Amino acid sequence: MGKNIFFNAHHSPVGAFASFTLGHQGNTGGFDLELAHPPDQNIYIGLQEDGSKKYLALPFFGQGEDERARYTSEQDAIKEESAAGVEALSQAEVGIQTEDGIQTEIHHQVNNATSVYIEPFSEKEITRTFEAATDEWQAGDISFKLYSPFTSVPDPALAQEEELKQAIVPSIIAELTVDNTKGKNTRQAFLGFQGNDPYSSMRHLSDTTDGKLCGVGQGRHVAIATLDERVTSASFFTMEGILEPRVKENLHFGLGQVGALLMDVPAGEKQTFRFALCFYRGGYVTTGLDTSYYYTKFFKDIEDVADYTLKHSEQKIAEAHKANQLVSDSSLNEDQKFMLAHAIRSYYGCTEFLLHEDKPLWVVNEGEYRMMNTFDLTVDQLFFELKMNAWTVKNELEQFITRYRYYDTVSFPGDSKEYPGGVSFTHDMGVANAFSRAGYSSYELHALDDCFSHMTHEQLVNWILCAAAYIEHTGDQAWLKEQLPLMEECLTSMVNRDHPDEAKRNGIMGLDSSRCMGGAEITTYDSLDISLGQARNNIYLAGKCWSAYVALEKIFNDAGLHAQAQTVAKSTKMCSYD
């Protein structure tokens, strides 16, 4: 890995639109469920220094807010609930020497009047091993490893229930290893977070499982849990208050926003603790269409998710190591492997496997924009999805057919006369869990000629390319037969957008959709200048048109539709010449 090891990465279950984001210094990560950005939570992963009340932690926290001030008077606010009888709170500024010599600071609210305080490890003390499905940090006597396995999601129409449960359980696995073999004293380690959901309180999972699970969570949506009896759960206003309570009974305090799991490792021992980091969203989660997460068919709540994950953790860890090989065993160079591993993680962090009227519905959200099944990205992710689970490609294509297909007319720029157009598809299916109305995207506006205009022609060729690749990869002849009439419609629509006079066609787009209402169509390069942004007579789009024509020619010839194949062949030839 390169010099900079402090970058955020997604650590995501498949199809849960969730990520445990971690890696950048400060409070820049945490439990991300359906968000457009990292949640900026304090994540606490640390270990007590031998024979001291100083704790060293991985640097994934910043200034912590003490919720106590909301409940107490100004005089009471300066009193700390601790064994030492503390009198004042202050802000600690801890300097970290970076590799380039620049002094940076991580701020965290600590209790300077006691001997308990938390410092981050220095950058030079930390190493990181980053792969497609595992991510490990090592510093001092601790190591912290995350497993976010990914595997093929079985087709729900064919799979057994257990296969699907294993593939889409909404959780990842963490391991914290403490090496106290050289220590002279028992040392305490911790794993916790400061939640920032204003609508949910921190809670203990032991309360709802009769003590079977040890864990902390915020509301019903996120949790850290273990089956390890060596671990104790705790919650309080601050992490420091958890590490030095007045009495241990106070660790079950209900008002604080910090929750943590505590572990004591005796001198001379090395111990590993395993945790499930879980997500759950029950009930309907979208508007426009009433959908729920597919995993809710198998798991009734987050406790159920945690229990299943921990009992199947060995299998999930084995899956993670196998998933690493997809990248590590490739012939790519190291930079390419890094980018692919990052891309895979980001992809799964955006996947949303939903249930609509008892049928599967697959969504990939567009990163921070959260637009749903943006077609420009569906075609980009096509080959990975075909490799991993081709049925999701068909599912997306069918969603475009049944709800996000429309018909238009076309016209030349500056001319209101309309000519036959044909079928096309929307840019996306909605945004931020709000499905858009049938036949319309969340993105596309009318009467524009730049960003936010319609992408009618590009989405038409995207549907053709995705459908052709799916058919070629799977050999799904039944689906091909069902879609042949639509394929013919797509051909008619493409040539109509070239020129209404067959003799004047050149194989590329020449007319704009009536949906532009006097404006002009754009391409996926919507934020660039007219050389790439304008769809009409665009060489970039011409390349996609040529590919679509080549694909259609093969499909029609294989289906015995030779007249249609000849029409396509003419456009293919003209497009390649231009």
Predicted regions and their residues:
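Beta-strand-rich N-terminal accessory domains
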Residues: 1-110
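Acidic/polar, glycine-enriched structural segments that form the non-catalytic walls/loops
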Residues: 2-19, 98, 103, 134, ...
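Secondary-structure boundary elements
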Residues: 177-186, 266-270, 387-392, 496-504, ...
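Extracellular-facing/secreted segment signature in eukaryotic proteins
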Residues: 75-76, 83-85, 94-95, 101, ...
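Active-site-proximal structural scaffolding
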Residues: 10-13, 24, 36-38, 60, ...
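Inter-helical turn/loop segments and adjacent helix faces that build the functional surface
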Residues: 180-185, 285-289, 307, 324-331, ...
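Active-site neighborhood of glycoside hydrolase catalytic domains
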Residues: 533-578
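Aromatic-rich carbohydrate-recognition surfaces in CAZymes
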Residues: 180, 295-313, 370-508, 517-524, ...
